């Protein structure tokens, strides 16, 4: 991973960046409406304040709708739903635009005016006529089908976990936790029951438990995060501070969609290939987070912030407490094991290396929320390694959380890829590249 610093400048956030994207076009403007509207979809979710796991679900809905619309016309892959019928000769480009637009406008009505402008701009590049009209109708049908399919998928209403009395190893609320009925409570409790997109059941992905508190493995992970993850650590290299800061502001959905767009352009993939790829990638990210939340609330393991302050209660003579420990970045408000970022990142990478190959790419990741940090990569493993480091050097995860998240994500990504959206005309489909 190479690290670049852009010039100092004012940070530009949220809706301002969304407006710029929609009015002036994304970096891949007019190259491929699937890629163009992927930029708009992710930016819209972020601008409207969605948290990382909600972003993942939403991106999967958009990209599966786009895939279903495009595939109803091209017929290259086995469909996700299969109920969308496209007239002969319908425009796949128009279908992609309309499918993304309709899902976006349904979920984010406050952004409708800017989405309308983006839709008009995209459709203006497509010749008028029956093909365009039929493509729009196909995209509309696909969007409505996906919206209906996910209407009662368990993602709402929000549910919270109220922690019990302090017990060594058990999760306790940290400073970021909201107050529910006067009690600081864990968020995302309902997410373990969200209907997956591409796996049958999150409970099929139950991990082995976290290391025992008295084990050498736990002590090693404890001492690492205490040393390099504290707010005032002198042992954290500047580049590890950068990745911790970057991935605190950047979800796996943001990072891996940006990477996927760049690699898809680099490899000159078709509209149909891109629609399938982005559907699979985002299905895997979303499903990995469902499975991760299932494991989190199953094991209910404490965060480093709690563990290190109470290090004299864990029964391990190798873990010295620091009652004043503060992490470098803010601890998310739910249990530690496994890492959501680690799970989602590795699920995305598992799909992407099967689609594109592991290495030899040129990927530049940036985020206007952290404008002075730009990260460059040539392989997907470099990204997942940085994300693993980011959460440990950020002080919010044990290394064992990251390792477990990686195992979970790789398993979910493999399952999503192997069981969804297969090529129609390949009787010897072999999972493309299987090199996790």
Where do the protein language model's features map onto the residues?
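Acidic/polar surface patches and capping/hinge elements
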Residues: 30-430
């Amino acid at each position: 991973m190479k690290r670049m610093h852009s010039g100092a400048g004012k940070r530009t956030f949220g809706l301002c960046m969304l407006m710029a994207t929609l009015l002036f076009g994304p970096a891949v403007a007019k190259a491929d409406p699937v890629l163009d509207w992927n930029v708009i979809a992710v930016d819209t979710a972020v601008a409207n304040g969605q948290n990382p796991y909600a972003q993942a679900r939403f991106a999967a809905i958009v990209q599966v709708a786009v895939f279903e619309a495009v595939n109803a016309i091209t017929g290259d892959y086995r469909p996700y739903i299969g109920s969308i019928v496209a007239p002969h000769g319908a425009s796949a480009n128009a279908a992609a635009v309309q499918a993304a637009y309709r899902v976006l406008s349904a979920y984010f009505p406050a952004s409708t005016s800017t989405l309308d402008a983006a839709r008009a701009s995209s459709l203006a590049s497509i010749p008028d006529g029956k093909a365009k009209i039929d493509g729009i109708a196909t995209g509309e049908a696909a969007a409505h089908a996906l919206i209906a399919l996910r209407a009662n998928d368990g993602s709402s209403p929000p549910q919270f976990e109220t922690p019990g009395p302090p017990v060594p190893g058990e999760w306790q609320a940290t400073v970021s936790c909201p107050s529910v009925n006067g009690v600081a409570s864990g968020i995302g409790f309902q997410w373990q029951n969200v209907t997956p997109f591409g796996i049958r059941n999150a409970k099929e992905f139950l991990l082995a438990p976290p290391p025992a508190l008295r084990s050498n493995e736990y002590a090693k992970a404890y001492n690492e995060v205490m040393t390099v993850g504290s707010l005032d650590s002198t042992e954290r290299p500047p580049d590890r501070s950068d990745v911790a800061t970057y991935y605190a502001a950047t979800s796996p959905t943001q990072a891996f969609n940006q990477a996927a767009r760049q690699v898809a352009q680099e490899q000159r993939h078709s509209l149909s290939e891109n629609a399938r790829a982005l559907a699979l990638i985002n299905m895997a990210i979303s499903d990995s987070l469902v499975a991760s939340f299932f494991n989190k609330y199953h094991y209910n393991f404490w965060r480093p912030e709690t563990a290190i302050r109470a290090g004299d209660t864990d029964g391990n003579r190798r873990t010295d407490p620091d009652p004043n420990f503060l992490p470098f970045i803010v601890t998310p408000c739910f249990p530690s094991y496994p890492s959501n970022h680690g799970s989602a990142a590795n699920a995305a990478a598992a799909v992407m290396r099967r689609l594109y190959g592991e290495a030899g790419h040129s990927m530049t990741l940036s985020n206007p929320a952290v404008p002075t940090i730009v990260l460059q990569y040539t392989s997907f493993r470099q990204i997942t390694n940085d994300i693993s480091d980011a959460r440990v050097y950020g002080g919010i995860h044990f290394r064992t959380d990251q390792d477990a998240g990686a195992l979970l994500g790789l398993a979910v990504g493999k399952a999503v890829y192997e069981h969804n959206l297969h090529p129609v005309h390949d009787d010897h489909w072999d999972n493309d590249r299987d090199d996790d």
